Amino acid sequence: MQFCPTCGNHLIVAVDEEGRNAFDCRTCPYHFPISTFLYSRHEFAQKEVDDVLGGEEAFESNQQTEVTCENTKCDNNRAYFFQLQIRSADEPMSTFYRCTKCKFQWREN
């Protein structure tokens, strides 16, 4: 994917008057003939879920609420929680909980 150095828009590959491939900008007159084979590959490292959500310490900085722990071996009624919109915007937010006592985690949609 190439971008126009003049206006910054995405360049398309088009065939010029001589039948050669060229990068053309749809919004300005920028035209760049392609004279060599162009290829580049970028591999991105996928982040771990803990990196995105903040890791182990993320829950401790959140609010607490009264909710019964879903771990059957725990009788605690307090949990840290946060909400995320992980589905489409017309769906309700998902609430993630972590027990303050046993550290058990669960979610409600």
UniProtKB/Swiss-Prot annotation:
The molecular function terms of the Gene Ontology recorded here are: DNA-directed RNA polymerase activity; nucleic acid binding; zinc ion binding
Which InterPro entries does its entry note?
A: DNA-dir_RNA_pol-M_15_CS, Rpa12/Rpb9/Rpc10/TFS, Zn_ribbon_RPB9, Zn_ribbon_RPC11_C, Znf_TFIIS
Residues engaged in binding Zn(2+) 1: C4, C7, C25, C28
Query: What is its subcellular localisation?
Result: Nucleus, Nucleolus
**Signal peptide annotation:** none
State the UniProt keywords alphabetically.
DNA-directed RNA polymerase, Metal-binding, Nucleus, Transcription, Zinc, Zinc-finger
Identify the GO cellular component terms for this protein. Answer: cytosol; nucleolus; nucleus; RNA polymerase III complex
Q: Which residues bind Zn(2+) 2?
A: C69, C74, C99, C102
Which family is this sequence assigned to? Belongs to the archaeal RpoM/eukaryotic RPA12/RPB9/RPC11 RNA polymerase family.
Job description of the protein? DNA-dependent RNA polymerase catalyzes the transcription of DNA into RNA using the four ribonucleoside triphosphates as substrates. Component of RNA polymerase III which synthesizes small RNAs, such as 5S rRNA and tRNAs.
Describe the protein's quaternary organization and the partners it interacts with. Component of the RNA polymerase III (Pol III) complex consisting of 17 subunits.
Q: What is this protein called?
A: DNA-directed RNA polymerase III subunit RPC10
Q: Say which species the protein is native to.
A: Schizosaccharomyces pombe (strain 972 / ATCC 24843) (Fission yeast)
